[in-house]
Amino acid sequence: PPPPPPQYFFFKQNTQSELTSSLVGSEMCIRDSTDPVEVVQKHFIDCISVLPHLDLQGGETMIDVGTGAGFPGVPLKIANPALQVTLLDALQKRLTFLDTLTQSLDLSDVTLVHSRAEDGGQNPDLREQFDLCVSRAVANLAVLLEYCLPFVKVGGKLAALKGPDAIQEIEQAQNALQIVGGKVTAVIPITIPHTDLQHQLVLVEKIAPTPQRYPRKAGKISKKPL
């Protein structure tokens, strides 16, 4: 694909600065770095590097499952204001922080949901309601599919940033893909400029409804992946 245009890699300076200082100075701080430049590279640019590959038309609904401190949902919302974003997390203190953060950044069309992913996936207000699901959760693709794909409409997609073992994970997730109604449509290498960060962006299209029994309870999902 053509190289991403510069606007994908830079926020408005004041917004980026405010977001960086809020995250580094809060209880939700990014613990692997307090250097603002490194934070921007490893987290903000890392998150929005997927945008050129998502083929967004404007106004899509997106859910960030296990959003934590707001990654990748908040940077994606800043970079693409037309997105209607839902941030889901199991810890209320994270959502309290995100409520303050999104208000201070004057972000509209952002909904915060306090829920575990497996419970949210069974909630009719959330189940199969989204055009796009994103997650930075560190989980095997088979596990991530069961957590995330129930939120996605048929015809929508899951965007998963994976490491160098992405192809192996896809091979191991064939059963999960068939069960929850997904199809891998692309595996795209992504390198973050001026860093040694490299990812494999795995795009999964939702081609069939997810059977109602999925997602299962968390213990079963992790202990006995599909």
What name fits each language-model region?
Residues S26-G58, T100-V110:
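Class I SAM-dependent transferase core
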Residues G58-G66:
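Conserved class I S-adenosyl-L-methionine
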Residues Q84-D89:
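Conserved SAM-binding motif I beta-strand of class I
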